[in-house]
Amino acid sequence: MDLQEAAMEARNGHRIPPTEEKVIIDTDPGIDDSVAIMMAFEAPGVKVVGLTTIFGNCTTSHATRNALILCDRAGRPEVPVAEGSAEPLKGGKPHVADFVHGSDGLGNTSFPDPTTTNKVEQSAAEFLVDKVSESPGEISVLALGPLTNIALAMKKDSSFASKVKRIVVLGGAFFAAGNATPSAEANIHSDPEAADIVFTSGADIYVVGLNITTQVYFTDKDMLELRNSKGKHAQFLCDICKFYRDWHVHSYGVDALFLHDPVSFTALVHPEYFTFKKGVVRVETQGICKGHTSMDMGLKKWNSDNPWTGYSPISVAWTVDVPKVLAYAKELLFNAQ
């Protein structure tokens, strides 16, 4: 095996990106966000350029505090954190899933404030625009919460969609039930106007919806293995996951927890573990189906224009290799040094 081939092989056979994957994580941490962020900090070949925060699993102010806690605990206090919008594009009180993630977003664990931080003065949208403009075509965005900050970046800079390398979105429910309402997934439901702007922007977008993420979960046995592992984040993650796991038992009747955000991070680094279908996606912005993601798969030729006409297709995750995604998550979490 030559050096180039060796660079393609990570521990346990997981491919390392042949070129460094630079990513800004737009996030509402959040318990499963925290798991994904710790994975990103540990992943070979991945450089976290910064974290931008948004409401969703908790308020934006709590999301910022939690992002700083995560950077501190990961030994990465130099990573910049930019605070994002406190409300959706249209204004109003944001949806906050404290019943899933606790009042603090970290399972009511009451961790102390970090001692060393790098919270920047820029807003999340300003940070996104500046970093992507500095390195056009090189920086991806992993969007783990409502898409408000991304939409604001696109409004601020009309060329943002063409300069960002790709945007991987945790959001939507494609031919599957929602989790905020029967028709809508939480991130999209929390700011449907922002989601529609992003999905129709022309950027290179990959969407990972509930139809994929609910196939991948850690059982109680997996969590026990994590707690007993030598991973440096294991105890912290197990502590915050208890609240999240108990909510799954109550809401879904399963002794497990879905890995929505870790799956989406894996789709960024290992898209080969998924298959995707392309189509134009629009978002319903009002009524009882607010937040519903509707995809034109191009299966027929329409006789006249419709609201999907003229927009660029995006890539929607269609299938997932569950064992490979689980193995990748365990590799990063169980062996973090």
From Swiss-Prot:
One of its GO terms (biological process) is purine nucleoside catabolic process. It is found in: Cytoplasm. It is an enzyme of class 3 (hydrolase). It holds the Pfam family IU_nuc_hydro. It catalyses: uridine + H2O = D-ribose + uracil. The active site is at H260. GO terms for cellular component: cytosol. The keyword RNA-binding does not apply. The keyword Cytoplasm applies. Its EC number is 3.2.2.3. InterPro entries: Inosine/uridine_hydrolase_dom (IPR001910), IUNH (IPR023186), Ribo_hydro-like (IPR036452). Signal peptide: none annotated. Keywords: Cytoplasm, Glycosidase, Hydrolase. Disulfide bonds: none annotated. GO terms for molecular function: purine nucleosidase activity; uridine nucleosidase activity. Belongs to the IUNH family. Involved in pyrimidine breakdown. This is Probable uridine nucleosidase 2. It comes from Oryza sativa subsp. japonica. The gene is URH2.
